[in-house]
Amino acid sequence: MKRIYLLMVGVYLLSLSGAEEGLNFPTYDGKDRVVSLSEKNLKQMLKRYDLLCLYYHEPVSSDKVSQKQFQLKEIVLELVAQVLEHKNIGFVMVDSRKEAKLAKRLGFSEEGSLYVLKGDRTIEFDGEFAADVLVEFLLDLIEDPVEIVNNKLEVQAFERIEDQTKLLGFFKNEDSEYYKAFQEAAEHFQPYIKFFATFDKAVAKKLSLKMNEVGFYEPFMDEPNVIPNKPYTEEELVEFVKEHQRPTLRRLRPEDMFETWEDDLNGIHIVAFAEKSDPDGYEFLEILKQVARDNTDNPDLSILWIDPDDFPLLVAYWEKTFKIDLFKPQIGVVNVTDADSIWMEIPDDDDLPTAEELEDWIEDVLSGKINTEDDDNEDEDDDGDDNDDDDDDDDDNDNSDEDNEDSDDDDDDDE
């Protein structure tokens, strides 16, 4: 029954794609590749695969909605397993109730999470649970943790990676102890942070790197931050990256969106929406870059850029939740706890704020002058006005009674 259901769902989801030769989108073939993991087969699975992808889930309840949600997750995993079948990656499920002892041994704590075991490392996937995102994430994981840059064209390719944190080191050769320390450090952050290395003196000269020196490139910055006190141990590199891995301006990416969202500052995010492919969005992004470059030394500033094109399924949700129009650039403050938000007034796409105006607005945010409680205070004020209005009504009634009494007295005098 399971196989028939998954086959039908797979066909329904993917059969709308064209079937021309060379563009055959994968459809689920009905073969079960995702298995249940237990204490008995763990050792065998680890020995068999280079990577082991584990979905840690709560027990499947009897209600239909929960069952369908679980089955949709299952078909995503089955499709990914099918696409990557030739890559020696195993896919398993771990029931939190049936395999509680195993989950504790593996260090799993959050139900609904996806983990990847690679050697002695456990990597948690904190991105969108979608087949294409998962495939890209796993392909990045099976690559070498360090990519070598050998010539000018590869330098150009490296320099065009502007929206990700990256490191590049210059070493004597692959046998260098300092290069090996660099490799070990890279494994701690793969695939979320890119590590590059060169053994070419001309490349190093172009990038202004000395022997055994490593440049740390923050997203959207023109110049790298050269890590001090070379040469470095693995521990020193890891410590430096962890200390500096929250950039001034970063992009929300499907592969690590939840981890990024949880990395807030004092419970808030400064969020900017801008479509890079749209002229106004591109212009606004360039203004954001300038602000980030001018304020890169401010540890309290971190702007989260979201390109709506990266998250088409979330656009309607964001517009409803934040009460904004995502067809034009937006920047605001979002409380990560309750999604309360307040947004900068941008009256017209043709009248985007300047870098100076944006900096002034951000300064007000960081000082607390602009905050997500403003709307709540306004609501309270409105309530206060209502109470005042009620009091006024009472006063009016009292005055009316007094007028009536005066009128009665006048009538008595007439009599």
Curated annotation (Swiss-Prot):
Key words of the record: Calcium, Glycoprotein, Metal-binding, Muscle protein, Phosphoprotein, Sarcoplasmic reticulum, Signal
Keyword Membrane: no
InterPro entries: Calsequestrin, Calsequestrin_C, Calsequestrin_CS, Calsequestrin_middle_dom, Calsequestrin_N, Thioredoxin-like_sf
PTM note: Phosphorylation in the C-terminus moderately increases calcium buffering capacity. N-glycosylated.
A UniProt-annotated Pfam family: Calsequestrin
Region (Disordered): 366-415
Leader peptide range in chain numbering: 1-19
Modified residues (Phosphotyrosine): Y282
PROSITE patterns: CALSEQUESTRIN_1, CALSEQUESTRIN_2
GO terms under cellular component: junctional membrane complex; sarcoplasmic reticulum; sarcoplasmic reticulum lumen; Z disc
Example of a GO biological process term: sarcomere organization
Compartment list: Sarcoplasmic reticulum lumen
Subunit comment: Monomer, homodimer and homooligomer. Mostly monomeric in the absence of calcium. Forms higher oligomers in a calcium-dependent manner. Dimers associate to form tetramers, that then form linear homomer chains. Interacts with ASPH and TRDN.
PANTHER family: CALSEQUESTRIN, CALSEQUESTRIN-2
Similarity comment: Belongs to the calsequestrin family.
Functional description taken from the UniProt entry: Calsequestrin is a high-capacity, moderate affinity, calcium-binding protein and thus acts as an internal calcium store in muscle. Calcium ions are bound by clusters of acidic residues at the protein surface, especially at the interface between subunits. Can bind around 60 Ca(2+) ions. Regulates the release of lumenal Ca(2+) via the calcium release channel RYR2; this plays an important role in triggering muscle contraction. Plays a role in excitation-contraction coupling in the heart and in regulating the rate of heart beats.
Name recorded for this polypeptide: Calsequestrin-2
Organism encoding this protein: Mus musculus (Mouse)
Gene expressing this chain: Casq2
